[in-house]
UniProtKB/Swiss-Prot annotation:
Rho-GAP domain ranges (all copies): 160-354
Parts forming coiled coils: 540-641
Function: GTPase activator for the Rho-type GTPases by converting them to an inactive GDP-bound state.
Protein name: Rho GTPase-activating protein 25
Length: 648
């Protein structure tokens, strides 16, 4: 048996799919949540923020009270706080959170909207959440947390990632830190160093909000002389608080807290650990932290007038630079003392922790063709960006000292020196930083110093004066700061002595007189090369000695800690024995008191029995008295009756 189907039947499912899509497009938020059941939240995952908000329905436009939970990257809402199954959820990364201005008739409504990231722009309005908070403060808190989880900038400046802000503002000129931070710091240094309670007293909230909106709108407002200094300080703190990730990244929060804990035991060790933590910061974060610490150091120099010492500034600013990812009051209270100590050290010792030699001024990208570079004026000093990976500090110093102009080849390197340089691996990954540190190029007079011919190199072997060992967790970075500083000073003295002898005492060869770029004789260069190689060996030996010194100091520290632990152990054992003895005495006393109490109870029971017996005896005596009274009355009556009979 065969089944015949009509010829006009259409098996195309596109029409049905379009009908389903149209029917879904007019669903309300609750219906969409039912159509796409929300993912079950992980109960073990700690919520970032919870609270009651009013949610506007999609079609009817009325408000419904819902309990919202911000957990991980999802925003859930429930009908009741006790419910375990959410009515809906939204995936926040890439979403947009914006505040909605209300009409004057709707005063008292604090409305904001969460728009999910979607390629279908026609359905954004259907999927967005329009929410209303009970107060302005609550709305700002929700907006801040939602924007932080969404990872999108809230505006041109506030709430934007630090690296994005710095990269964007390079079109206005080279800036190490955001323009907002520069303008606020310059204004405070000019008008606020003598202001009492700077950074501690709040500014005008409405003016702070106006300035924030102006910066977010792309404007660059300038502060006039009448602007309140406390308002500018509050604006700076607000910018630091609104960063999606703090200046000290969340991944290094525990490391900085550890530095604060080590300061109680060994401040030198804490400083070394802090140097390691600073070396792993992103370049933009390091520049901003360095700028702020130097700026705060200038503020505290006038602490006799403004009443803001290093400790006070560290307390009010540290929580804005170093904060936990989960803003739990218990976590904040636990980390506040350590943050205050670390911030105090960074402000007080900023010259050691943030040396100016580590500052890398930002310049426009270098031209690919070096021949097109503008010539540097004679007898002038400039800074040129290095493009190659940095080498060791000794290599970079020797090569830079040998050739003031790294781009001018004067001949091949000697074979032994070339092998020595090629055998040394770079200590730092060039990809770790967007911009390498800068080298100093110097144009000298016509007479070249003999250091010029000591080491010749090509364009591919550009070197820098100072190797950024500060940024790499190498063994030399573990040495004491004083040792490194002495090394660098000795090298600078050596370089100055060599340069002076070149200008004054070294005769030029005929080749150098005929050609300003010529080199001196090979014997002079060989002797100078030997001197520099010996300097390299001395520096390596110094680094080894410093490593041994660090090991010895570490061993001594461990031994002292072990002794301290043994002493504390003995003290604790003595205390435990004393407590056990006191506990036994108390227990014996309790037993004795219990026995006495039992005896008192028995005595009390016996007294009660005696009292009852006395009561019974008294009752018996009273009964006998009443009986005797009756008998006496009867006897008296019987005696009176015979007398009456005898009278007649």
């Amino acid at each position: 048996m065969s089944l015949k189907l009509p010829r006009n039947w259409d098996f195309n499912l596109k029409a049905e799919a379009s009908k389903i899509a149209r029917s879904r497009s007019v669903m309300t938020g609750e219906q969409m949540a039912a159509f796409h059941p929300p993912t079950t939240p992980n109960p073990l995952e700690r919520p970032i923020k919870v609270g009651w908000l009013k949610k506007q329905r999609s079609i009817v436009k009325n408000w419904q009270q819902r309990y919202f939970v911000l957990r991980a990257q999802q925003l859930y809402y429930y009908k009741d706080e006790e419910d375990s199954k959410p009515q809906g959820c939204m995936y926040l990364p890439g979403s947009t959170v914006k505040e909605i201005a209300t009409n004057p008739e709707e005063a008292g409504k604090f409305v904001f909207e969460v728009i999910p990231a979607s390629s279908d722009q026609n359905r954004i309005g259907q999927d967005s959440y329009v929410l209303m908070a009970s107060s302005q403060v609550e709305m700002e808190e929700w907006v801040k947390f939602l924007r932080r989880v969404a990872g999108t900038p809230s505006g041109a400046v506030f709430g934007q990632r630090l690296d994005e802000t710095v990269a964007y503002e390079q079109k206005f000129g080279p800036h190490l830190v955001p323009i907002l931070v520069e303008k606020c710091a310059e204004f405070i240094l000019e008008h606020g160093v003598s202001e009492e309670g700077i950074f501690r007293l709040p500014g005008q909230d409405n003016l702070v909000k106006q300035l924030r909106d102006a910066f977010d709108a792309g404007e660059r407002p300038s502060f006039d002389r009448d602007t309140d200094v406390h308002t500018v300080a509050s604006l700076l703190k607000l910018y630091l608080r609104d960063l999606p990730e703090p200046v000290v990244p969340w991944s290094q929060y525990e490391g900085f807290l550890l530095c604060g804990q080590l300061m109680n035991a060994d401040e030198a060790k804490a400083q070394q650990e802090l140097v390691k933590q600073l070396s792993t910061l992103p370049r933009d974060n390091y520049n901003l932290l360095s700028y702020i610490c130097r700026f705060l150091h200038e503020i505290q120099l006038n602490c006799a007038v403004n009443k803001m010492s290093v400790d006070n500034l560290a307390t009010v600013i540290g929580v804005n630079l170093i904060r936990s990812k989960v803003e739990d009051p218990a976590v904040i209270m636990r980390g506040t003392p350590q943050i205050q100590r670390v911030m105090t050290m960074m402000i007080r010792d900023h010259e050691v922790l943030f040396p100016k030699s580590k500052d890398a001024p930002i310049s426009p990208p270098a031209q690919k063709n070096d021949a097109k570079k503008a010539p540097v004026p004679r007898s002038s000093v400039g800074w040129d960006a290095t493009e190659d990976p940095p080498l060791s500090r000794t290599d970079s110093f020797s090569n830079t000292a040998s050739s003031p102009d790294a781009t001018s080849p004067t001949g091949p390197l000697p074979s032994d020196q070339h092998q020595e340089d090629s055998g040394k691996a770079p200590r730092e990954n060039p990809g770790d930083w967007k911009m390498q540190s800068r080298k100093r190029t110097q144009t000298l007079p016509n007479r070249k110093c003999f250091l010029t011919s000591a080491f010749q190199g090509t364009t591919s072997s550009k070197l820098e004066i100072f190797k950024n060992e500060f940024w790499s967790p190498s063994s030399e970075a573990k040495a004491g700061e004083g040792h490194r500083r002495t090394m660098s000073q000795d090298l600078r003295h050596l370089s100055n002595d060599q340069r002076t002898s070149t200008y004054d005492n070294v005769p030029t060869s005929p080749q150098s007189q005929g050609n300003p770029a010529g080199a001196l004789s090979p014997p002079a260069s060989d002797s100078k090369r030997d001197a520099l190689v010996s300097t390299d060996s001395e520096m390596e030996a110094g680094s080894k000695n410093s490593g041994e010194d660090d090991l010895d100091s570490l061993q001594r520290t461990v031994q002292s800690l072990q002794k301290e632990i043994e002493t504390q152990k003995q003290v604790y054992e003595e205390q435990i024995k004393n407590l056990e003895k006191e506990n036994y005495d108390v227990w014996a006393k309790v037993v004795r008191l219990n026995e006495e109490l039992e005896r008192e109870r028995k005595k009390f029971a016996a007294l009660e029995i005696s009292l009852r017996n006395v009561e019974r005896s008294r009752e018996d005596v009273e009964k006998r008295n009443r009986v005797l009274e009756e008998e006496v009355k009867e006897f008296v009556k019987s005696m009176e009756k015979p007398k009456t009979k005898t009278d007649p």
